[in-house]
């Protein structure tokens, strides 16, 4: 399954405006259907967020500790996996969006296929060791 990550124009604008990757509150939301539009100004602009039920809460959840490594090319990293525990019928996601707490989207992650967590199981988003995205 090919995973594709794309940056939003608003993320680049936020970075240029001294947005701090390591101290800002950043969330990840799951989508059952989603498309990428580089000019979207809100994480909810395109796509259908996973329904608020069965272990998923609208808006997703805050991601863990973040670091930024490198000098010429900077890689934005998230140190721990983000995990949801499915209840009831569980839920399915096809994409995720990272966004700043104000709702400004940073990047769109397309999993390339539906990923399902059955009730009682976990749905884990393991972040790439090399970084979620890089600039440079």
Where do the model's predicted regions map?
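Small cysteine-rich, disulfide-bonded extracellular modules of the LU/uPAR three-finger superfamily
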Residues: 1-94, 100-136
């Amino acid at each position: 399954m090919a995973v594709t990550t794309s940056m939003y124009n608003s993320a680049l604008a936020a970075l240029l405006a001294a947005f701090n990757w390591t101290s800002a509150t950043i969330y990840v939301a799951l989508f059952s259907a989603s498309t990428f539009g580089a000019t979207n100004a809100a994480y909810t602009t395109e796509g259908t967020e996973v329904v608020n039920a069965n272990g998923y809460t609208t808006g997703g959840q805050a991601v863990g500790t973040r670091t930024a490594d490198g000098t010429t090319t900077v890689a934005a990293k998230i140190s721990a996996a983000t995990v949801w525990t499915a209840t009831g019928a569980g839920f399915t996601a096809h994409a995720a969006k990272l966004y700043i707490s104000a709702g400004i989207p940073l990047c769109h992650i397309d999993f390339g296929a539906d990923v399902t967590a059955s009730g009682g199981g976990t749905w884990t988003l393991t972040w790439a060791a090399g970084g979620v995205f890089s600039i440079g």
